[in-house]
Design a protein with these regions (language model features):
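Bacterial N-terminal signal peptides that target proteins for export
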Residues: 5-14
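Bacterial N-terminal signal peptides
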Residues: 14-22
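N-terminal signal peptide c-region/cleavage motif recognized by signal peptidases
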Residues: 24-26
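N-terminal, motif-rich segments that launch catalysis or mediate targeting to/interaction with membranes
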Residues: 28-159, 166-314
């Protein structure tokens, strides 16, 4: 118990330092576009450090049973540009197939109540951990069908990215939200005075989005984030334990960030009535943006690391 307490204490100190750094920074998720960003970052990292793994993935990707949908998004692209774009579209693919036979809605999140009501709501909602474990096993199995491994690849790219978003790991229960706020989907806020009301969850999902074609967000963020946050600057990329244990740790990080930053500020006045949605403060906007940037680039690196573990690549 003392060892676990020590680990938790170190983790909270680490997260507090992150928030302190964000609070002193200037202001400069996830949507489909942000998932494309994590996919691009993962590709870049593998290209730099594990190019043989990318080659090993090519025949697996070629066997994807929904390849026609993916290829339709890559028209006119060739060579490296096409290979990188394929990673981007694979990362968002689970969102694109919602409502189809490939859909697993509960794999996108794994929520724990972080309010004082956690004592009466101790269980988890969502099965991201189960989805991660299942797809990791399939991708790691050389004897599995290539089509199944390709589907598992897309889900791993997506799930690992999803759970970096704090509100994919936490929700709030209270007298206002007796059955929870459904990870911020029932509470409305506004980014600026006079702005349109937006769900708190959507606020976080879309925080880095850029207007334009589907890859506009990836083009705006993928390379700048890697320059700002190279692996050496991210101590959270130090791993220990099984893939399952590492995934659990990533969920714990997001849970703590939801408590320390996500469910603060205007959320404390958020309302089910969109018309009465309060305005988030400039400080909240700045901190949430900085957190999103770091979590997105971390998610991209972790996707690459997950694939290395699954395919036993150095």
């Amino acid at each position: 118990m003392s060892g676990n307490y020590g680990c938790m204490k170190k983790r909270h100190i680490f997260l507090a330092l992150i928030l302190a750094a964000f609070a002193s920074s200037e202001a400069n998720a996830w949507s489909r576009e942000t998932h494309m960003t994590t996919g691009a970052i993962a590709f870049d990292d593998l290209e730099r450090n594990s190019p043989a793994l990318l080659a090993a993935l090519e025949p697996i990707i070629a066997a994807h049973p929904d390849r026609a949908r993916l290829d339709a998004s890559l028209k006119g692209l060739t060579g490296r540009t096409r290979a990188r774009a394929m990673f981007e579209w694979l990362a968002r693919w689970p969102d694109d197939v919602r409502g189809t036979a490939y859909d697993h809605p509960k794999w996108h999140y794994e929520l724990r109540v972080i309010s004082s009501w956690s004592a009466i709501w101790p269980f988890r909602n969502g099965t991201a951990s189960q989805g991660f474990d299942k797809n990791f096993r399939i991708l790691a199995d050389n004897k599995a069908k290539s089509a199944d491994r390709a589907v598992a690849l897309g889900w791993l790219l997506h799930i690992v990215g999803d759970i970096q978003q704090p509100l994919h790991a936490a929700h709030w229960a209270s007298w206002t939200y007796p059955m929870s706020d459904r990870a911020g989907t029932l509470g409305f806020v506004r980014r600026v005075r006079g702005g349109a009301p937006i769900e708190l969850h959507e606020f976080w999902d879309q925080i880095l989005d850029r207007a334009g074609p589907p890859d506009a967000t990836a083009r705006a963020w993928a390379q700048p984030l890697q320059r700002t946050w190279p692996r050496i600057r991210l101590p959270e990329l130090g791993y220990a334990g099984t893939p399952h244990a590492q995934f659990a740790y990533w969920l714990d990080e997001s849970l703590a960030l939801a408590w320390m930053a996500g469910y603060r500020d205007a959320f404390l006045r958020a309302t089910r009535d969109a018309v009465a949605a309060p305005i988030t403060s400039p400080r909240y906007n700045m901190i949430s943006n900085r957190i999103a940037q770091r979590r997105v680039v971390t998610g991209g690196y972790r996707i690459a690391d997950t694939l290395r573990m699954a395919l036993k690549a150095p």
